[in-house]
Structure formats: C-alpha cells, structure tokens
Amino acid sequence: MNHKAQNKKQAKSSALAWTKNAWEDYLHWHKNDTKIFEEVNSLLDECLRNPFDGTGKPEPLKGNLSGYWSRRITKEHRLVYLPEDNGIYVIACRYHYS
C-alpha cells in the first residue's frame, strides 16, 4: 500500500471529536498564538496514533476525570482527551485541568 493510501486509511479510522469548550480553546490558539496552536496540532496527531505514549508526558487522570488522559502543551496549559476506539474526544486544550 502506498503512503497516500495508508494516510487515507488512517484518516478514516481516526477521528477527533470536541466539546464546545475544547473547540473554543482550539480556536483561541489559532487566533492568538501560532506556536501553541502548532503544538496542540502536533499533540493531537500523536494522540491519534498512540493516545497513551509519546510527547507531552501523557498521564491518566483521576477522580472526576478518571478515564481521561492529559498531555502537557506548556507549563500552564494541558490537552485533556478521552481515548476512544475510533479516535479521541477532546475536552480541553487550554489552562490546567482542575
């Protein structure tokens, strides 16, 4: 299978879903900070490939967010997501979870 076909197959099998707040966070970075926006995109790509390992110090969350995972975007901001069979469900990509 050629590279283009592999990418197309992966795109169909991996999906991103967003909460309203997470999407607003994402648009905030798009408008206000290109560097962080690019980092978020990089982390999202990596989460789709392997939601439990990689950059950003992935860690499972506890308490009310049990089942969700977090990756560090910056010292202040985290990407918080729920790994699912067909992709990830993003609940935040701005500020620290609490």
Language-model features and meaning:
Residues 1-15, 21-24, 28-38, 42, ...:
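Enriched for short, Lys/Arg-rich terminal
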